[in-house]
Amino acid sequence: MEQFHGTTIISVRRKTPEGYSVAIGGDGQVTLGNIVVKGTARKVRKLYHGKVLAGFAGATADAFTLFERFEAKLEKHQGHLVRAAIELTKDWRTDRVLRRLEAMLAVADSEASLIITGNGDVLEPENGIVTIGSGGAYAQAAAMALLNHTEMSAPEIVKKSLEIAAEICIYTNMSHTIETLP
């Protein structure tokens, strides 16, 4: 059976006078092969009492499994994002069921932005931009330009980057969900 796939998830961290503003967004398109089966899926959400932003790309059922496991790690480690991500990837690499999951997570809190890969790696990009999914490279290029050459806020950059990705990537649509942290 074919997997549900294709999406764009982007998180942007922008320096503000008060610290950092963080936003994450994703499109709503879910495809099965070459057919769009849903256009308004919610692939980003707030976790751990609204203090952590997370989004997924990949097989939907696998992503929900990872969300649940990641949220359990956040609870266990009192919301410490990096520690929870590392502990999740330790499990991911040693658990036979988790090793077969085909999904990636983009996660962020007030201090860090991370990519948790399907290989069980934790990556922290240097520029505060995290992208995953089929339209990720397009959204990343747009966000880099907007972050470096405009005064747009993090949520504005996320929105515009998703719009640009949707114009290029056939697996990304214009139905967006955006979540923010102050």
Curated annotation (Swiss-Prot):
Catalytic function, reaction form: ATP-dependent cleavage of peptide bonds with broad specificity
A single Gene Ontology CC term: proteasome core complex
Record: residues binding Na(+): A166, C169, T172
Location of the active site: T7
EC number: 3.4.25.2
Activity: how regulated: Allosterically activated by HslU binding.
MF-aspect GO terms: metal ion binding; threonine-type endopeptidase activity
Function field: Protease subunit of a proteasome-like degradation complex believed to be a general protein degrading machinery.
Protein name (record): ATP-dependent protease subunit HslV
Source species of the chain: Albidiferax ferrireducens (strain ATCC BAA-621 / DSM 15236 / T118) (Rhodoferax ferrireducens)
The encoding gene: hslV
